[in-house]
Regions:
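N-terminal membrane-anchoring/stem segments of glycan-assembly enzymes
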Residues: 1-61, 376-379, 408-419, 447-456
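A conserved acidic beta->alpha catalytic loop
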Residues: 99-108, 123-128, 165
Length: 457
């Protein structure tokens, strides 16, 4: 709808103060949409190219890979996750399960792995339940004390969620990813296990696939890859560059870590050759709670702007600044969504009253809103067609994905309210137990923790 048409329906004169404000808002909205579309197009094109490589590779000295798995009441899922890791025949792999003061049998279930590569660390009050970052920092202190005979550049610290299932070849792929000396961190892809039985889980899977296939792959080109909380691998020497306790108390300590690593001169790499599989949230209420926490954590990253502007260069700096400012852009975008809904209502009223108007704007709005989604549909279909997804169904999912993408308009403002009122404490999101895991967790476990369990100090 043109600004003249809007003025006709609202009774505003184009030369009145409100009319001028209306036009400024209209063109401002178009400008924001144009910037978002150009950014998406740039990342889409960048993601199709090969990553930049410049540094020499390490010699064939072995890497020690230590997987840290922070857990709080994860008895339902931790057993299967540990078994999946111990099934990988890699003598240079170690698994450290961090029981962060659980009330259930998390430690006992993990300790039943029966593999000498598995260690259970128990955190007790008052050191327990201080956040994922604090749990990781305490575990890292143990890793450092145990690996003094190995150069820190040859020690890789991985982070996995308790419900994570790494691809069988993921550890060997991690070794390949860290061959270049400049690589300080590697993030693998994320897939949602239960996407076949839940539409909400399907949207989360599509979200992760689009994010990794377009934006993470594109960021390989500009050296601004972000880190996630699952299947994150970091060189110990890169963590050392961030100090003795590299993970912060941010609600999104993974995002925070990735930003700060990019500012140290190390290269963050995205590795698409393998992925971690996790359970998606199937309850809208729990999803909104989870995403509110993530959004609030991203809001807390604003203090990193100065370091990024000072330490990074070129397109990498520009994109990292974009990542930090994204939640604020989404909040502004939510106002555009509200404005569009008001415009739709105005147009509907005009149609009922038989006012003359052009509907060409509606076609343009559809192209702007759903055009990128059709590209996403093709990308997602290409990834999922081996699992029986047809192209028409992918297009249908892409339209639902646009509506799913409106959720930040709701939970974003909730996150702002929590941040402004100083509410930063969160209970973890309940896991979605798989049937096989639920059966196993019901089995009797020993009441005492085997000797393999190590208390954190």
């Amino acid at each position: 709808m043109s600004t003249q048409a809007l003025s006709l329906h609202t009774g505003l004169s184009p030369l009145s103060p409100l009319g001028v404000l209306d036009r400024v808002g209209w063109w401002g909205a178009l400008g924001m949409i144009a910037v978002a579309l150009v950014y998406t197009l740039f990342m889409l094109l960048a993601s199709r190219g090969a990553p930049r490589r410049s540094g020499p590779s390490h010699p064939d000295a072995p890497l020690l890979i230590v997987i840290l798995m922070p857990c709080l009441n994860e008895a339902e899922v931790i057993g299967a996750s540990v078994r999946r890791l111990t099934s990988i025949p890699d003598p240079g792999l170690r698994i450290m399960v961090i029981d962060d003061g659980s009330d259930d049998d998390t430690a006992q279930v993990a300790a039943q792995a029966g593999d000498e590569r598995v260690e259970v660390v128990r955190r007790r009050p008052p050191r327990a339940r201080l956040g994922k970052g604090e749990a990781l920092n305490d575990a890292l202190s143990i890793v450092r004390s145990r690996s003094t005979s190995v150069p820190s550049s040859r020690v890789i610290v991985g982070v996995m969620d308790a419900d994570g299932r790494l691809d069988p070849h993921a550890i060997s792929e991690a070794r390949r990813a860290f061959a270049p000396q400049e690589v300080g961190a590697v993030q693998m892809g994320v897939r949602i296990n239960n996407r076949f039985g839940s539409l909400l889980a399907r949207m989360q899977d599509m979200e992760f696939v689009i994010f990794t296939e377009v934006f993470q792959r594109g960021r390989r080109r500009v050296r601004s890859v972000g880190m996630g909380g699952n299947a994150q691998f970091v060189r110990l020497s890169a963590l050392d560059a961030l100090g003795p306790r590299p993970w912060t108390r941010s609600l999104t300590e993974d995002f925070d870590l990735g930003i700060r690593l990019n500012a140290t001169g190390w290269t963050n790499e995205f590795w698409s050759a393998s992925a971690v599989h996790q359970q998606g949230v199937t309850s809208m209420r729990r999803l909104m709670r989870q995403r509110t926490r993530w959004f609030q954590g991203n809001l807390q990253a604003l203090h990193l702007l100065r370091a990024v502007a000072r330490e990074q260069r070129g397109l990498g700096r520009a994109d990292t600044l974009w990542q930090i400012l994204t939640p604020y852009l989404l909040l502004t975008g939510s106002l555009l969504t509200l404005s569009f809904l008001i415009t739709m209502v105005t147009a509907a009223v005009a149609a009922v009253l038989r006012w003359e108007q052009s509907w060409a704007w509606l076609v343009g709005a559809y192209v702007i809103a759903f055009g990128p989604a059709l590209v996403y549909a093709w990308i997602y279909w290409r990834i999922e067609r081996g699992n029986g997804l047809g192209p028409l169904k992918a297009v249908g999912y892409s339209h639902l994905f646009v509506l799913y993408g409106l959720l930040p308009s709701v939970y974003g403002w909730r996150a702002v309210a929590r941040e402004l009122t100083g509410r930063t404490g969160w209970a973890k999101t309940a896991r979605e137990a798989e049937p096989a895991q639920a059966t196993e967790s019901a089995r009797s476990v020993s009441a005492t923790v085997p000797p393999a369990t190590h208390p954190a100090t």
